[in-house]
Amino acid sequence: MHVKKGDKVQVITGKDKGKQGVILVAFPKQNRVIVEGVNIVKKHSKPSQLNPQGGIITKEAPIHVSNVMVLDPKTGEPTRVGFKVEDGKKVRIAKKSGELLDK
């Protein structure tokens, strides 16, 4: 998967197209990510011990990883991700600027 938790991304398709946010959780097996402030859904919850009130809760739902692009650290524009071996380690680079994405 070309994105990781903590990456700044932009949504490129769907109802939230153009929105930017940080990846909160990544699910590599399902190829899905949860992006902060994107794909907000309303969830109805029964009263429980954790939430005695119950009611409607708004939270982020996962979106497919193909619908997001990493933002270039240099320019702030969406960019594709490339891989390169440096000092025996595989690192991610931004295709537009060649900047390293992994610190």
Curated annotation (Swiss-Prot):
This is Large ribosomal subunit protein uL24. Part of the 50S ribosomal subunit. InterPro entries: KOW, Rib_uL2_dom2, Ribosomal_uL24, Ribosomal_uL24_CS, Ribosomal_uL24_KOW, Translation_prot_SH3-like_sf. One of two assembly initiator proteins, it binds directly to the 5'-end of the 23S rRNA, where it nucleates assembly of the 50S subunit. One of its GO terms (biological process) is translation. It comes from Bacillus mycoides (strain KBAB4). SMART domains: KOW. Belongs to the universal ribosomal protein uL24 family. The gene is rplX. The lineage of its organism: Bacteria, Bacillati, Bacillota, Bacilli, Bacillales.
